[in-house]
Regions:
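Hydrophobic ligand-binding cavity/cleft-lining segments
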Residues: 1-49
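A short, structured loop/turn motif at beta-sheet edges
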Residues: 10-14, 74-81, 105-115
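A non-catalytic, amphipathic alpha-helix used as a structural packing/dimerization or gating element
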Residues: 139-147
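Short, surface-exposed coil-to-beta transition loops
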Residues: 2-4, 65-71, 97-103
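Beta-strand/loop substructures that line and gate deep hydrophobic ligand-binding cavities in soluble
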Residues: 85-139
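Glycine-rich portal/gate segments that line the openings of hydrophobic small-molecule binding cavities
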Residues: 38-92
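Short, linear, compositionally biased motifs with a strong N-terminal bias
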Residues: 152-153
């Protein structure tokens, strides 16, 4: 199963790439539907560091636990296009039943705007759980699109 976005953001590509490495942006584009919190003693880092796993937890609407997972960023290029991939995995709760791959690619449109390709591919155990969760995932991804469009000019 997957959810994805292909949206144009009103921000330069370097600003978008920088914002995607910010835990505060991850939090801002998913709440109130999914509220993330750091499990690290010192809270969220200022930036995600490639190769360094950061423990997090999430709750639907801030009250219904979704479980623990971790963010583990990789940066690479595909045919000259920068890609950010989260290799993190679930530890408990719903996240513990999920195998996922989250990739975001940014393309400079040459006019000060950026094309963002954002795709989450996931598999749940049992598979029917993935089907049941898909409508909610789709709603969260549409919310992400709205919030990213709203926030991008401030990046």
């Amino acid at each position: 199963m997957h959810v994805g976005l292909r949206i144009v953001l009103d921000a330069p590509v370097d600003a978008v790439r920088d914002a995607l490495l910010s835990p505060s942006v991850m939090v801002a584009v998913t709440k109130p539907f999914l509220v993330y919190r750091s499990r690290a003693a010192g809270g969220f880092p200022e930036r995600w560091t490639p190769g360094r796993a950061e423990p997090i937890t999430a709750a639907a609407f801030g009250v219904v636990p979704s479980g623990d997972t971790h963010v583990d960023i990789d940066l690479y290029e595909v045919q000259g296009v920068p890609v950010q991939r989260d290799n993190g995995g679930g530890v408990s709760g719903l996240f513990g039943r999920m195998d996922m791959s989250h990739r975001m690619a940014t393309v400079d449109l040459g006019d000060g705007r950026t094309l963002l390709l954002d795709r989450l591919t996931y598999r749940m155990r049992p598979a029917l759980l993935g089907l049941a969760l898909w409508p909610g995932m789709w709603v969260i991804w549409q919310w992400r699109a709205l919030r990213m469009r709203q926030l991008a000019p401030t990046w």
